[in-house]
Amino acid sequence: MIIDKTLFLKKYLNQSSLNEDLYPIVKDICENVRLHGDDALRNYNQQFDQVETCNLEVAYQTLENAYNRLDSDLREALQQSHARIQSYQESIKWTKQQGTSDCYELYHPLERVGVYVPGGKASYPSTVLMTVTLAKVAGVKNISVVTPPQLNGIPDIVLAACYIAGVDNVYQVGGAQSIAALAYGTETLPKVDKIVGPGNQFVAYAKKYLFGQVGIDQIAGPSEIALIIDDSADLDAIAYDVFAQAEHDELARTFVISEDEALLKQLEQKIQHILPQIERQSIVQASLNDNHFLIHVNNFSEACDLMNQIAPEHASIQTVSPHDYLNHVRYVGALFLGYYSPEVIGDYVAGPSHVLPTNQTARFTNGLSVNDFLTRHSVIDLSKDTFDTVELTARKLAHVEQLYNHEQSIEIRTSKEFNDDKN
């Protein structure tokens, strides 16, 4: 169905992507893990994943063995992806002292980080690379991965990615319970400073509940893409861009925006023609039934405005002049320009992390980067000469705020000199 911008904004845009009924369930899970530690984790593995886990931690040798079992072409693919991610993240890392000679900022890596790697419907070695590599470039001392247990063990491809990226520990536990374990620490899992990585609604709510106890990257909703297209776009490619997003899960959201209503109708027909032939059809069909939107706009300005209001995780511009949109599309997780920059390349190998804000949160937050694994603090290191130029201002402001001990803290330094060598 094709709808216009006004109807879309009124009826569909602000729908919540999270099920509020899950929040009390997640709270109970987290509290149970806090109180009962490893025993709770083993019970949840049995209850939710039907897997009995005597050992929650995966032996490190298992990672190397998994890597060695992989076909050489898969090892090469993982290594190329890792190399591109590493190179890009090194290029954007905050490393230099910023500021002036007497006021500046310093950066330090976090000590312990936990990474959630989804499992279940698919294996996600790419998530390992798109998170752990960033933490390693930042200089994080200890990186723990949690991922749901499986009857036949964690897939080799995921363990091999952990080996390549340099993970320190892997634990077979998933869901809200794994987030709680990393936040509180258990007999086996270490308490971490920050948790990153995408997951389902249970994972998202666990992060929300535990934020403050531990740092988080974001509270992620279902994956999403918004595309702006014109008659230069290849509709077969656009259809598969839609399918690629929709196959993540039934809640994944896809938006296609165009000034050309006839083109949107052609795309709708193309999607229906190809759909019976694709893999993972049932998941894609469910996503398209409830969360797929073809939106007609009147002009360039409306297209950009709508994209900024949707603020999607992924924005793709497939028009005759995609770079025209570069400074007008502002609030997106990542922006993909042109035919040869499909969103899927960003999922695996481009370089920026594929852990991105969803559900309009790109209007105020950013995708994961190496700098999310650094702390930043200001350093104030004044000489007496500089102090003498600013102390009166500080005293006046302290006085007007009636913070008289603040004022006295400055006053005492105007009457007593301290021998130093900064003058």
Swiss-Prot record:
Provide the binding site for NAD(+).
Answer: Y116, Q177, N200
UniProt GO molecular function: histidinol dehydrogenase activity; NAD binding; zinc ion binding
Q: Which reaction does it catalyse?
A: L-histidinol + 2 NAD(+) + H2O = L-histidine + 2 NADH + 3 H(+)
Please give the Pfam families that the UniProt record associates with this protein.
Histidinol_dh
What cellular component GO annotations does this protein have? cytosol
- Cofactor(s) the protein needs: Zn(2+)
What's its top-level EC category? oxidoreductase
Keywords of this entry: Amino-acid biosynthesis, Histidine biosynthesis, Metal-binding, NAD, Oxidoreductase, Zinc
Task: Note the SUPFAM superfamilies from the entry.
Answer: ALDH-like (SSF53720)
Gene3D superfamilies named among the record's database cross-references: 1.20.5.1300, Nitrogenase molybdenum iron protein domain (3.40.50.1980)
Query: What EC number(s) does the entry state?
Result: 1.1.1.23
UniProt-annotated binding residues for substrate: S223, Q245, H248, H314, D347, E401, H406
User: Active site at which residues?
Assistant: E313 (proton acceptor), H314 (proton acceptor)
The record's cofactor note says: Binds 1 zinc ion per subunit.
Q: Which GO terms describe its biological process?
A: L-histidine biosynthetic process
**Which pathway does UniProt place it in?**
Amino-acid biosynthesis; L-histidine biosynthesis; L-histidine from 5-phospho-alpha-D-ribose 1-diphosphate: step 9/9
**What family does this chain come from, according to its entry?**
Belongs to the histidinol dehydrogenase family.
Its function, per the record, reads: Catalyzes the sequential NAD-dependent oxidations of L-histidinol to L-histidinaldehyde and then to L-histidine.
* Designated name of the protein: Histidinol dehydrogenase
Can you name the source organism? Staphylococcus saprophyticus subsp. saprophyticus (strain ATCC 15305 / DSM 20229 / NCIMB 8711 / NCTC 7292 / S-41)
Q: What is the lineage of its organism?
A: Bacteria, Bacillati, Bacillota, Bacilli, Bacillales
